Design a protein with these regions (language model features):
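Short, solvent-exposed turn/loop segments enriched in Gly/Ser/Thr/Pro and often Arg
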Residues: 89-91, 154-166, 238-248, 337-342, ...
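Conserved, mostly hydrophobic/aromatic
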Residues: 87, 146, 156, 173, ...
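Loop/turn elements at helix/coil->beta-strand transitions in domains of secreted/extracellular proteins
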Residues: 81-82, 147-154, 229-236, 330-334, ...
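Aromatic- and carboxylate-lined catalytic core of secreted/periplasmic carbohydrate-active enzymes
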Residues: 520-553, 568
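The feature marks proteins involved in alpha-glucan
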Residues: 9-86, 93-112, 118
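Conserved alpha/beta catalytic core and glycan-binding cleft of carbohydrate-active enzymes
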Residues: 77, 247-252, 321-322, 328-330, ...
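Beta-strand signatures of extracellular beta-sandwich domains
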Residues: 2-6
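Substrate-binding/active-site clefts of carbohydrate-active enzymes
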Residues: 89-152, 159-328, 356, 362, ...
């Protein structure tokens, strides 16, 4: 019997170092340099030849599945197998009613804002301008709950100044939105019924531009992070750097900052704006008030940032990247929205994320850089850009298809994939091969999030959305047993299990905006909360479940079994 270490088309015979009742153990030492090492193993037993790579034992050689070792690449130890909890702040808990967005405070996407008075009301189909009042004080008030649940990391959806409740259209990267922070100076008027221009929304302008409100909000956020750290929890922020919002002070399409003290003219307002090159304009003859700018996917509410044409913009965003992970905030990392879309060329995209990683790790070496990405992330996971990704392809999708037969938006049902263990393992192995071990150990493993239907709704195996089937249908025919099975997989699979707020309380919902319902305080499913707490406890007590490798044990009709191993620790 012989075992070979195969690297760069060279075979090196390995030395048998140990034998026990079950296995023979072989080793081989290799001197690393600065280059990535890709390798696999060849095993000869009598007349039988086979190979071992990320798929396990196999009969063929495929470079895609080779093991990868990147010298010097490490991901934060605290994130390996950590339990994340995603908070969509407006819908979590209202701890300070004085900062609530008011009805008629300003105009947003064709209509005026609405303050929702009934916390238990479900979001409207166009719920982007509805505000429930959840805020950072509410998170502080519920810290005991999060700690008792076993949360290791709080992941916040965007918190920076923004006119929407989702806040993926950032208005000011330097400050936490006072509507989720603190409003200490509150003057001005609401919009009158016949007013539709936000330059007259003096109450809103005062709230989001007055430095007293902005600085007090940043101070409150620093307190939230400090409190989380005192309880042994980490905090990561959502960074939206591919685009900003049309309300942004650099663009100022709403003319909010045009006459506000201490602010420059926005690029929409004036051609000589210092922010002109932050955006790409198609018609240089439309100033003042030039709306001919590039929007992400054509959305004029989401101006695309034009990094390649502005060193000042690049420098500023890299400053923001450093600012929030350094003192006094000391955030523990970034989740990066639509990260692969940033810039206008693949070359610039990779250049930027290398710079982003460099400045973040210089400011806080233990910070995580985690990207939203659909498709293979392999090109970005080479040790000098992202640490990891939201794990759609190698977790959310295979688990959803196997247990429910549903697509993650509830847009399709596939009977041939439900309970199909071979398809499950094939997807997990194929997409998991895009990760090195350090990246896989910290991958964000979600069942639900703000962009997809709630997993509990998917268990009803019903194709639909809010506009087609209505709210009630999201809760009809749901299967708690299937959801428990999903949570069990989530808490035992390699990576960082991530709970979307309210999933643990039995929340249902179609894809957005219905998946952004308010947390049902006082109406929680206590059995589901206890089950999450129980499974999280198992996850945290068994080292193999936090950091161990995974091996397929069984694949059958509606049946999967797997083992996790980490040194002397094993689990099945």
């Amino acid at each position: 019997d012989r075992v070979f270490f195969v690297c760069k088309d060279e075979k090196h015979i390995m030395l048998k170092t140990e034998t026990d009742n079950y296995f023979d153990y072989y080793s081989y030492s290799v001197q690393l340099d600065n280059e990535k090492l890709t390798y696999y193993f060849e095993v000869r037993v009598g007349r039988i030849d086979c190979y071992y790579d990320t798929r396990g034992v196999c009969k063929d050689i495929n470079e895609y599945y080779h093991f990868q070792l990147i010298p010097g690449f490490k991901t934060p130890d605290w994130a390996k197998g950590a339990v994340f909890y995603q908070i969509y702040v407006d819908r979590f808990y209202n701890g300070d009613p004085s900062n609530d967005v008011l009805s008629n405070e300003y105009q947003y996407i064709g209509d005026k804002t609405v303050k929702v008075e009934d916390w238990n009301k479900y979001p409207a189909a166009m719920g982007v301008r509805e505000f429930y009042g959840g805020d950072l004080q509410g998170v502080l008030d519920k810290m005991d709950y999060l700690q008792d649940l076993g949360v290791d990391v709080i992941y916040f959806n965007p918190l920076f100044v923004s006119p929407s409740n989702h806040k993926y259209d950032i208005q000011d990267y330097d400050y936490i939105d006072p509507h989720v922070g603190v409003i200490v100076h509150d003057e001005g008027e609401l919009l009158h019924p016949d007013q539709k221009e936000n330059r007259f929304a003096s109450r809103y302008i005062e709230r989001v531009s007055d430095k007293r409100n902005l600085e007090a909000s940043n101070e409150l956020f620093a307190r939230v992070v400090k409190e989380a750290h005192a309880r042994g929890m980490k905090v990561i922020l959502d960074g939206v750097f591919n685009h900003c919002g049309s309300f942004n002070k650099w663009m100022d399409r709403e003319r909010i900052y045009e006459n506000a003290p201490g602010y420059e003219k926005g690029a929409y307002v004036a051609q000589d704006s210092p922010y002109h090159n932050y955006f790409h304009f198609h018609d240089n003859h439309k100033w003042p008030y030039n709306g001919s700018y590039d929007g992400w996917w054509g959305h004029d509410t989401l101006p695309k940032l034009n990094y390649e044409n502005s060193q000042q913009l690049e420098d500023y965003i890299l400053y923001i990247a450093r600012k929030w992970v350094a003192e006094p905030y000391h955030v523990d990392g970034w989740r990066l929205d639509v990260a692969a879309d940033l810039g206008h060329t693949p070359e610039y995209n990779h250049y930027f994320w290398k710079e982003f990683r460099r400045v973040v790790k210089m400011a806080n070496p233990d910070a995580i850089v985690l990207a939203e990405h659909y498709g293979s992330p392999k090109d970005w996971l080479q040790g000098d850009e992202w640490d990891t990704v939201m794990n759609y392809d190698a977790f959310m999708e295979p688990v959803t298809w196997f247990l429910t037969g549903m697509q993650k938006h509830s847009d399709d049902y596939r009977e041939d994939l439900r309970g199909n263990a071979d398809s499950f393992w094939g997807a997990m192995q194929h997409h998991g091969a895009s990760f090195t071990t350090p990246s896989l150990q910290v991958a964000m493993n979600e069942l639900s999030n703000h962009d997809h239907s709630r997993f509990l709704t998917r268990t009803n195996q019903t194709v639909g959305r809010l506009v087609s089937l209505g709210r009630a249908a999201a809760s009809e025919g749901i299967r708690y047993g299937v959801f428990r099975a999903a949570v069990m997989v989530q808490m035992t699979w390699p990576g960082a299990p991530t709970i979307y707020y309210g999933d643990e309380a039995g929340m249902c919902g179609w894809t957005d905006p219905d998946n952004r319902r308010p947390y049902p305080w006082g109406k929680e499913n206590l059995e589901m909360i206890e089950f999450h707490r129980y499974m999280g406890g198992i996850h945290n007590r068994i080292p193999a479940l936090k950091r161990g490798s995974v091996i397929k044990l069984l694949a059958g009709n509606h049946l999967i079994a797997y083992g996790r191993m980490h040194g002397k620790y094993k689990a099945a």
